[in-house]
From Swiss-Prot:
Keywords: Amino-acid biosynthesis, Cytoplasm, Histidine biosynthesis, Lyase. It is found in: Cytoplasm. Coiled coil: none annotated. The keyword Nucleus does not apply. GO terms for molecular function: imidazoleglycerol-phosphate dehydratase activity. This is Imidazoleglycerol-phosphate dehydratase. InterPro entries: IGPD_sf (IPR038494), ImidazoleglycerolP_deHydtase (IPR000807), ImidazoleglycerP_deHydtase_CS (IPR020565), Ribosomal_Su5_D2-typ_SF (IPR020568). One of its GO terms (biological process) is L-histidine biosynthetic process. It catalyses: D-erythro-1-(imidazol-4-yl)glycerol 3-phosphate = 3-(imidazol-4-yl)-2-oxopropyl phosphate + H2O. Its EC number is 4.2.1.19.
Amino acid sequence: MARNANVTRETKETKIEVFLDIDRKGEIKVSTPVPFFNHMLITLLTYMNSTATVSATDKLPYDDHHIIEDVAITLGLAIKEALGDKRGIKRFSHQIIPMDEALVLVSLDISNRGMAFVNLNLKRSEIGGLATENIPHFFQSFAYNSGVTLHISQLSGYNTHHIIEASFKALGLALYEATRIVDNEIRSTKGVI
């Protein structure tokens, strides 16, 4: 069974289109109006070993908040759809990733109980067109819509770029590992995820 999804989400504020194939490493195309966010999305999808296209149009381009939130929602929905009933997935994963002085831990459970606990000390208020206050919000919106319980904790570091990038790398690697097929069972005592 192919594990991919095409999801479009359009509001009065944005139009987001996501194609995601979690089993085929291939081309990644990302286009949003926020340069640093493009870099982080490419990083996330690369470390997920996926094929993906993310296109985001901001209909009210006065702030980056709506783009960040709506991409997170749509990407989360795409992962949830691609996983289907989650039969056979490993389900859990954690990664501790360094980027120079920064060290970030990501631990997740594809539980269908989407929530995020984010502990990042981001000293810069903006980087490459992205308000850093939207980074935790991205992770929260993504987790809620993907059905992933997500913990992200900064263990060390002071460079905002490094901390954020280590977070996206760790999330990508953890998602890759947790979505791997390891058997034909639903990994839950309930028999359903």
